[in-house]
């Protein structure tokens, strides 16, 4: 039995499909999306970013239980989303200050959990870069930061989705074999830390615990893990989390993300859905940049739709309802916020 306040419960239900699975689309990228569109189009224009997000939202949210957006470029996309699609809203500033050690997080100054809720948001999402092996003087800042967000979300009774992105302060290439060997332990440490009640997190938005480019049978070159080792890392992460968790696509291709979710399904991992971003829509950027709105719309109605609906099928096969970590739906006791 778990007690959950009505605002948080209602938010989680609005973000989930009829099976209680969070089959969500992510397009809250800001700086990186601006760069990608600029490279494809040759010009930089805020409206291009807004229009791209709006078209993605319009065409793909009929196949998503929810969409993750930002209020900097995403307002037209929020308005364009399908009626039945829930809304997660980003609260953190994009990127981090590279001149300061520790990749410290920061919030958008004119935003709050209350304002996100007033704007129709069903959940607050925060991304934080996290190296569990960095000095305490860096990590304590992040811990206190997240405690404040958790308290804010509790106060206005809105779900808190936390996305910890792990890194290593000394191994700076996150795509390297060296980092691939470190990654499982980093992801496990982040789950252990941020599942603590003090943070008030409702759903963890997690990286998969291995880099599939280095998994035996998937790797084209060097191998960091056998398939059995990779499966063990998935299972251990699943068992470690007392909270519902979903997977993020982390910039991999649609094909690779599908293989990743198939792998999780094969090993009975208790994940409750995905927040899939670039794996779904990134190939549409080149189409948009070179051929414009109508060509992108056509791409979204064909390849984009195929990317998201084939992922939905995989979720049907393996994802579990968000309340599974608490037992059955009947074990969730909804209470009014005091």
UniProtKB/Swiss-Prot annotation:
It catalyses: D-tagatofuranose 1,6-bisphosphate = D-glyceraldehyde 3-phosphate + dihydroxyacetone phosphate. Keywords: Lactose metabolism, Lyase. One of its GO terms (molecular function) is 6-deoxy-6-sulfofructose-1-phosphate aldolase activity. Pathway: Carbohydrate metabolism; D-tagatose 6-phosphate degradation; D-glyceraldehyde 3-phosphate and glycerone phosphate from D-tagatose 6-phosphate: step 2/2. HAMAP family: LacD. Its EC number is 4.1.2.40. NCBIfam families: PRK12399.1, PRK12858.1. Coiled coil: none annotated. It holds the Pfam family DeoC. Gene3D superfamilies: Aldolase class I. Belongs to the aldolase LacD family. It comes from Listeria monocytogenes serotype 4b (strain CLIP80459). This is Tagatose 1,6-diphosphate aldolase. It comes from the Bacteria. SMART domains: DeoC. PANTHER family: SULFOFRUCTOSEPHOSPHATE ALDOLASE. One of its GO terms (biological process) is lactose catabolic process via tagatose-6-phosphate. Transmembrane segments: none annotated.
């Amino acid at each position: 039995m778990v007690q959950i306040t009505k605002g948080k419960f209602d938010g989680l239900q609005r973000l989930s499909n009829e099976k209680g699975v969070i089959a969500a689309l992510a397009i809250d990228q800001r700086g990186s999306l601006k760069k990608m569109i600029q490279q494809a189009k040759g010009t930089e224009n805020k409206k291009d970013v807004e229009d791209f997000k709006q078209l993605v939202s319009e065409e793909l949210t009929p196949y998503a239980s929810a969409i993750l957006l930002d209020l900097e470029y995403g307002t037209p996309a929020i308005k364009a989303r399908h009626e039945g699609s829930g809304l997660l809203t980003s609260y953190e500033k994009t990127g981090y200050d590279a001149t300061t050690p520790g990749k410290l997080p920061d919030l958008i100054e004119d935003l709050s959990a209350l304002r996100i809720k007033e704007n129709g948001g069903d959940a607050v999402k925060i991304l934080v870069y996290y190296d569990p092996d960095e000095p305490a003087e860096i990590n304590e800042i992040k811990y206190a930061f997240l405690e404040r967000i958790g308290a804010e979300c509790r106060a206005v009774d809105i779900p808190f989705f936390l996305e910890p992105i792990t890194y290593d302060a000394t191994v700076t290439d996150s795509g390297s074999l060296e980092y691939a060997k470190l990654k499982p332990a980093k992801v496990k440490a982040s789950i252990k830390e941020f599942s603590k009640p003090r943070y008030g997190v409702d759903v963890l938005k997690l990286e998969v615990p291995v880099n599939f480019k280095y998994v035996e049978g998937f790797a084209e070159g060097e191998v960091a893990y056998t398939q059995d080792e990779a499966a063990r890392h998935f299972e251990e992460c699943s068992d470690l989390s007392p909270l519902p968790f979903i997977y993020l696509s982390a910039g991999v291709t649609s094909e690779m993300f599908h293989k990743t979710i198939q792998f999780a399904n094969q090993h009975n991992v208790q994940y409750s859905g995905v927040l899939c971003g670039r794996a779904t829509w990134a190939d549409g950027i080149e189409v948009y940049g070179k051929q414009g709105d109508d060509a992108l719309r056509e791409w979204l109605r064909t390849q984009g739709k195929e990317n998201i609906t084939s992922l939905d099928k995989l979720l049907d096969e393996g994802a579990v309802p968000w309340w599974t970590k608490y037992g059955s739906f009947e074990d969730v006791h909804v209470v009014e916020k005091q």
